């Protein structure tokens, strides 16, 4: 016998409650038809669990709430996992680009906070990053900035993966990192 629909809805609400969503940009768009213009809205939303998973989505509808709902659902379908150092910052400096938009991101010491502008800040807040320094170059279009940020985040690698790629032990890589940090200070 089939389960009642209500239980399925409750499960979905519990699963959705673990995510934090941020509206990055809303745009009024117009479709020209025979009788004039038909207005609608396009929304860009970033969704994350603040534990290393994040996604973005784009939704279009005649009303703002419906566009935001569509964008949120789209974002939840395309989540990526980003490894974080100590659960608060990036493992290494990284850059990304999309179209004419470029971003540079650097790991930061505890207490630095999120030093990033506009759409990038929303991505970091939903991702769960607490300390990062980021700079956007080129295009300031929110769509390009978010896509460039995601391009950079996809390039982020855990030190264990880097060690495996180089064919060395993780402890050797960590020891090198320790000496590099000691010489900086």
Swiss-Prot record:
Domain of life assignment: Bacteria
BP term (GO), one: translation
Residues annotated as domain S5 DRBM: 19-82
Key words of the record: Ribonucleoprotein, Ribosomal protein, RNA-binding, rRNA-binding
InterPro entries documented for this protein: Ribosomal_Su5_D2-typ_SF (IPR020568), Ribosomal_uS5 (IPR000851), Ribosomal_uS5_bac-type (IPR005712), Ribosomal_uS5_C (IPR005324), Ribosomal_uS5_N (IPR013810), Ribosomal_uS5_N_CS (IPR018192), Ribsml_uS5_D2-typ_fold_subgr (IPR014721)
GO cellular component: small ribosomal subunit
Pfam family, one: Ribosomal_S5_C
SUPFAM superfamilies xrefs: dsRNA-binding domain-like, Ribosomal protein S5 domain 2-like
GO molecular function, one term: rRNA binding
Record remark on domains: The N-terminal domain interacts with the head of the 30S subunit; the C-terminal domain interacts with the body and contacts protein S4. The interaction surface between S4 and S5 is involved in control of translational fidelity.
Function: With S4 and S12 plays an important role in translational accuracy.
Assigned protein family: Belongs to the universal ribosomal protein uS5 family.
Subunit structure and binding partners: Part of the 30S ribosomal subunit. Contacts proteins S4 and S8.
NCBIfam families: rpsE_bact (TIGR01021)
Protein name (record): Small ribosomal subunit protein uS5
Organism from which the protein derives: Chelativorans sp. (strain BNC1)
Record lineage: Bacteria, Pseudomonadati, Pseudomonadota, Alphaproteobacteria, Hyphomicrobiales
Underlying gene: rpsE
